[in-house]
Amino acid sequence: MGSSFGHLFRISTFGESHGGGVGVVIDGCPPRLEISEAEIQFELDRRRPGQSKITTPRKEADQCEILSGVVDGKTLGTPIAIVVRNKDQRSQDYSEMQVAYRPSHADATYDAKYGIRAVAGGGRSSARETIGRVAAGAIAKKLLREIAGVEIVGYVKRIKDLEGQIDPETVTLEQVESTIVRCPDEAIAPQMIDLIEAIGREGDSLGGVVECVARRVPRGLGEPVFDKLEADLAKACMSLPATKGFEIGSGFAGTEMTGSEHNDAFYTDEQGQIRTRTNRSGGTQGGISNGENIVIRVAFKPTATIRKEQETVTNSGEATTLAARGRHDPCVLPRAVPMVEAMVALVLCDHLLRQQAQCSWW
């Protein structure tokens, strides 16, 4: 229950952080799409641990293996299974957590729900679960590019009180990947890196905001009323580990405007297309894409597992303290960028197929 996502382009992820491996089964991918392990690996390398001095030191190659659904570099239209083997586990680092709950982590709630949990690495609550999402997202991105020319670019917008000034209309993947913190603001990125390093030395952690833009999204995607495009985007992004907030377009800032200030005025461009002069709606109106760029923001809390000693209780309710061992990100934001991109791609891909199925007959 709860490990599958999507309707026509549907994924199911599997595996635990310290188990044999993690992965995904993708059902509904159209046949004859050219895809390679190298294309999937590119996205996984952006997500993998140990990639820089500001991420977890856990060393995993995260090498993907396509088990089914692809032959001679083309999809068959049958389920695609992708697996990544776990290699660098240190389960002994979690011995104290057999009985002591990590504050603000899923330990206590998993115990409350299931009466059992995978202590080492956090099991399914670990961010290693997102390997399957990112792998599936690589295929969804390729499909969106091939069918509609959609481009998806995510980046770190904010860490703590440091906020980058980035234009979602023009930002490129190359700019994002030019810095280990994945903030393409050249003035702010070094400050973010210094802040993450400093807080890591203290045994603490930081949160922030990832912004993501999807360009050239076709009009008409979204299924009112309960499957509005922004509703599905919110669900997708909020299902990622450590997420605590979602905005689209002007978001909460729109509450400070009047209707005349917030409304996006229509006009007809030189190609005869109906466009909007501003994009405070963030690319959707009435739950349906309007052809403008879709711009979302996702808030991530500070990493829950930290080395600083904290008050907590045991699974029997006794007061204790916990200074967590293990290898954890002092800030999840740099590695969260490809995760957000993947979830946006999965939603858009699913809705594109749904739109084709329902509304392209005549």
UniProtKB/Swiss-Prot annotation:
Entry GO CC: cytosol
Name the Pfam families for this protein.
Answer: Chorismate_synt
Top-level taxon in the UniProt lineage: Bacteria
Provide the reaction this enzyme catalyses: 5-O-(1-carboxyvinyl)-3-phosphoshikimate = chorismate + phosphate
> What GO molecular function annotation could you give as one example from this UniProt entry?
chorismate synthase activity
Entry's EC annotation = 4.2.3.5
Q: How is the cofactor bound?
A: Reduced FMN (FMNH(2)).
Q: Which family does it belong to?
A: Belongs to the chorismate synthase family.
Protein purpose: This reaction introduces a second double bond into the aromatic ring system.
Q: Entry's HAMAP family?
A: Chorismate_synth
Name of the protein: Chorismate synthase
Organism annotation: Synechococcus elongatus (strain ATCC 33912 / PCC 7942 / FACHB-805) (Anacystis nidulans R2)
Its gene?
A: aroC
